[in-house]
């Protein structure tokens, strides 16, 4: 596994964050379902995005890839020659690709397999399976990293648990408008990560699809709708912006370009979290609810570690089924740098009441990315609080979401050396 020595002090400079991966996935899919050509500008070819592009091509979309834009023609999507032809969709490690396209791939009768790697198929799919059983859609595991789907999605009533992943809802919201009859999605329990549904609904509206949202407890979908092509630019990704915002709040000086202050992205909440931490002056523990923002919990934990306060980030059990057990990985790796964190079943407790400036350590500490892009990037920012060098494994797992992160890190003054040990 690739290992490098990494060091950082105060990061300074200017960054233009990558486009929102969440929005880009959705624009690619919607464009691929539209009659006509759409132009999607501001593109980053991360591993996850490449997986979605190639998947939609397998379903018949014509996608022309340019340096910073895509031209997508969906007029041939779901043509007969793309159905029942033993097609195989490789999702790599992209949960969005898998869960968005699982129902979409069978809006017409189809037999198709999905494969992936890493922990992809350890992430739950039961929310789909329970509904597929109801409508007699067949599914079977070929092996631990591949599943065969055989059947046709039907209009009707679907029930989805609200506390597992909003991706199941998004997959159905893309698919059900294309069917002949009307449909309803009912949410069991409280919907978490509702901001991702807002992004989906906004995308669908842009492409001409109308959904009735009844307070996030049910969604009414009229059938026989048609996606309309269009030209759109993808805004900056607050999931990645969060790393630089936290870096600035703990001593770096980075100018961040191109932010949409009116963004629907839930991870924009990092701004509020930073403010809450900085302005908390009570003796009791500060409690932060991470249920709506799972992707920024590692970097939020770092911010909490530097605050000289006791902070607990709660409602984050879902982090255990990400690319890694992200809750455990966050605690384990930041603890190696001298921070005081406690892993709980559904939360992280951080006690940083001691005076904090920089952690001094002259030894070379070994840290693991856990092959998780967000852990790797959190470690990079954590080094601005650390007097010393670390060894990091598999640092290029960042390609999943931010392919040029380490180039940006170097441009801001970070250091990366070969590890010859």
Describe every region a protein language model picked out.
Residues 1-421:
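Short, structured segments at the rim of ligand-binding sites
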């Amino acid at each position: 596994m690739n290992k490098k020595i990494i060091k950082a002090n105060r990061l300074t400079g200017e960054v233009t964050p990558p486009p929102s991966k969440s929005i880009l996935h959705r624009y690619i899919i919607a464009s691929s379902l539209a009659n006509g050509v759409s132009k999607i500008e501001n593109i980053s070819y991360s591993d996850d995005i490449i997986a979605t592009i190639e998947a939609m091509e397998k379903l018949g979309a014509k996608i022309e890839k340019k340096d910073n834009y895509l031209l997508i023609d969906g007029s041939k999507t779901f043509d007969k020659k793309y159905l029942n032809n033993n097609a195989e969709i490789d999702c790599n490690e992209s949960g969005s690709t898998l869960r968005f396209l699982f129902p979409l791939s069978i809006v017409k009768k189809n037999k198709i397999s999905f494969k992936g790697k890493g922990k992809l198929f350890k992430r739950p799919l039961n929310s789909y399976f329970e509904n597929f059983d109801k409508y007699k859609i067949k599914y079977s595991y070929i092996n631990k990293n591949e599943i065969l789907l055989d059947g046709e999605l039907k209009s009707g009533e679907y029930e989805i648990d609200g506390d597992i992943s909003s991706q199941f809802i998004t997959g159905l919201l893309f698919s059900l408008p294309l069917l002949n009859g009307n449909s309803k999605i009912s949410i069991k329990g409280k919907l978490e990560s509702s901001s991702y549904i807002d992004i989906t609904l906004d995308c669908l509206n842009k492409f001409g699809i109308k959904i009735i949202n009844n307070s996030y407890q049910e969604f009414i979908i009229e059938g026989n709708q048609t996606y309309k092509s269009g030209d759109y630019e993808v805004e900056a990704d607050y999931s990645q912006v969060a790393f630089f915002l936290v870096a600035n709040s703990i001593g770096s000086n980075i100018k961040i370009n191109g932010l949409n202050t009116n963004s629907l992205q839930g991870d924009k909440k990092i701004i509020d979290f930073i403010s809450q931490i900085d302005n908390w002056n009570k003796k009791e523990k500060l409690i932060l609810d991470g249920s709506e923002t799972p992707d920024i919990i590692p970097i939020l934990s770092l911010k909490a570690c530097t605050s000289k306060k006791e902070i607990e980030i709660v409602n984050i059990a879902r982090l255990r089924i990400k690319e890694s057990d992200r809750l455990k990985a966050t605690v384990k790796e930041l603890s190696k740098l001298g921070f005081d964190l406690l892993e709980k079943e559904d939360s992280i407790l951080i006690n940083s009441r001691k005076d904090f400036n920089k952690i001094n350590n002259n030894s070379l500490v070994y840290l693991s990315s856990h092959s998780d892009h967000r852990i790797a990037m959190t470690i990079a920012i954590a080094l601005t609080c650390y007097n010393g060098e670390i060894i990091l494994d598999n640092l290029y797992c960042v390609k999943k979401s931010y392919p040029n992160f380490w180039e940006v890190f170097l441009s801001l003054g970070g250091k990366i050396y070969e590890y010859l040990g």
